[in-house]
Amino acid sequence: MSQEDEYLSVEQFLELQKAETREIIESLKADGSEPDALYAIEHHLMAEDFKALENAVVEAFKMGFEVLEAEELEDEDGAKILCCDAVMDSALDAEVIDAQVEKLVNLAEKYDIIYDGWGTYYEGEDAEYDVIEDGDED
């Protein structure tokens, strides 16, 4: 969320994430992705402060997530932000992914970083490995 967006409580944000999770899963299935495959669920974390992100990802690792190396990017205003993914292999099960999201949203709240949704890759014989992200349109 940008600073211009209306503030959402953690509970409201989690409800939005649940709806987006179901949309992503339905999009994958509608596109023919293998429903019984194991998917690498990539949860996106962002922070302006390296130490806050570092503390959060150490805790995410202890929760069983694989944490990918952080990258430094610039936002639309030119400010530097650090981004990384916390990854967990999972079935396309909304309740399982909801539980992962809830853990990481609460972690983001604890360390004052941003949980920026999740994405995964299409799985199937014709997979080209396009990433499906929350908020993307078909």
From Swiss-Prot:
Listed SUPFAM superfamilies? Hypothetical protein VC0424
Gene3D superfamilies referenced in this protein's UniProt entry, alphabetically: RraB-like (3.30.70.970)
**Per the record, what is one GO cellular component?**
cytoplasm
Could you give the subunit structure recorded for this chain? Answer: Interacts with the C-terminal region of Rne.
Q: In UniProt terms, what function does this protein have?
A: Globally modulates RNA abundance by binding to RNase E (Rne) and regulating its endonucleolytic activity. Can modulate Rne action in a substrate-dependent manner by altering the composition of the degradosome.
Recorded family membership: Belongs to the RraB family.
Q: Which NCBIfam families match?
A: PRK11191.1
Protein name, as recorded: Regulator of ribonuclease activity B
Q: Organism, per UniProt?
A: Aliivibrio fischeri (strain MJ11)
Point out the gene that encodes the protein.
Answer: rraB
